[in-house]
Each structure stands twice: as structure tokens, then as C-alpha cells.
Amino acid sequence: MSNGTSVKKRNGSIEPLNLEKIHSMCEEACEGLAGVSASQVEIQSGIQSYDGISTAEIQEILIRSASDLITLDNPNYQYVASRLLLFSVRKSLYGRLRELPTLEAHIVDCVSQEVYDPEIYSKYSLEEIRKADGFIDHSRDFLFTYAGLRQVVDKYLVQDLSLIHISEPTRQAEI
């Protein structure tokens, strides 16, 4: 269902705003959690869509909305906010929410983008990388609280600082 507004997807394409996708995302984030409501997250978000709003911006609004609903009486919203943040991270990193790449494929991709140093191949054999991949259980990502996942994202994920605009206030020479 669209209201005539278009959204800009993370890959740069433009498509009509689909409110059902927002609802489905909230439903999935609330799945299996007691005392939470996808509709409440949507209502709390008060999304004021405008033509050309990015899907990343919509996701951030939903994350803040769920985060704002965390209270002593409604603690499970911390998991709703965490899941919404996790969906955002996965979409940004891999372009999808499910069917995540193997550790080997992730390393190859990061080396090709010059995020990782190629020296990683001299430190770990392919066998070791594949063995490590066998220990990764992505379903455990859903055990993070919002505060925990936010800290991992903000402090420990590799950030592309070239995308951050840093400006220093103009200083006037003292005479």
C-alpha cells in the first residue's frame, strides 16, 4: 500500500512508499516477545514521510520509536529496538536481512574494498576461517539488548570515516 510518496532505497533506487513493508518490519521485530506491539512502535514513530525519504531514515525513526517505548513496565521493547537496529546494520552491510554471507566471503569482500588488510590471509588459513565460520550462529544476534547492540555498532564496527563531514569553526586571526 502506497500513499503516493516515493522512498530512496539504500541501493539508490526509488520506489513508492509501501506502508505494508514498514508494518512487516515492525511485526518481525516484535515476533515472539511478550508485552510489545508492532502497531505501538508504528504509532510512536509518527513517521512524517516526505517524497524522497530514505529507507535508512525510516528505519532510524522506527529504532528511536521502539527505544522510546522501553520502560520498566515494558522492557521487551529493548529487544524490538535491537532487532530493528540489527535489520538496519545487516541491510547496510550486506544489502539484505537474511542469507548472510559466510565469514570467508565477508573477508574476501572486505579485503577487496580495502576495509581489511590483505595480510589477514597470511595470518589465517582458509581452513581456519571456515572452522571459525562454523562457530558463528547469527540467530544469537537477536539476544542483544538495544543498549548492547548500539554500543557494538557505535564503538566496534569499522566506520567509513570518509563519509563523515568534519568541519572546524572558522577562526579569526587575533590582531
Predicted regions and their residues:
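Often metal-dependent polyanion-binding catalytic scaffolds in large enzymes
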Residues: 1-19, 23-162
